[in-house]
Amino acid sequence: MHLTCLSLPAPDCLRRAIIPTRDDLPPLPPGQAAHLCATAPIACGDDTAIPVAQWAGRMPIAHAALRARDHGAWHGRALHDLPAPDVARWIADPDFAPPDGESLRAVLVRAADWLSRCPTGHANMMVIADTMVIRALVLATLGTGAEAFAALDIGPCTRTLVTFHNRWRVREAGAAITF
């Protein structure tokens, strides 16, 4: 089985160091993605199912486990407006969660759980998700966790390929794609 993971473009607000709101969906490139999506089943976060469906030309399978990180009360706030010690912990401590939000470790656990339950009977499948979720899937494939998160650089608008033959393997990570 081949699991092709496409990382979504970054929301525009990130360029201004503002944490996206829950409704801040990344701008998907114009036009259809037929050449990328082919006929493989598409999975995505339940937070992006509608725009992904419009972009891909068909309805994806929405999974809560593939949604972007929940930043709780920090959604829509500029980093410079948040308490500096909390921002430092948010960056350095995988167990830190913003108020009413989710820790990095929680994202890693839910992505790893999804991967462990991913049906491997398909010849191909596609995941379209936030870069953090794609990184979490790669870490789960490698059998590592939060300690390796900062060492893995997978940017927006990239392709990552993992395969399954008795176990998950990373074939390609963070390759640039053209829409």
Predicted regions and their residues:
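Phosphate-coordination/substrate-recognition cap region in phosphate-metabolizing enzymes
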Residues: P11-C13, L28-V87
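GST superfamily/GST-like fold recognition
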Residues: T131-R135, F164
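Active-site catalytic microenvironments for nucleophilic, acid-base chemistry
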Residues: W55, R117, A140-T144
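Generic beta-sheet signal
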Residues: L3, G121-M132
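Glycine-rich phosphate-binding loop signature in dinucleotide/nucleotide-binding domains
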Residues: L36, C118-A123
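Short glycine/proline- and acidic residue-enriched helix-loop micro-motifs
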Residues: D86-A106
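Loop-to-helix element that buttresses phosphate recognition and phosphoryl-transfer chemistry
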Residues: M1-P51, P99-A111
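Acidic, low-complexity terminal tails and accessory targeting/binding regions
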Residues: M1-L3, R69-D81, L139-F179
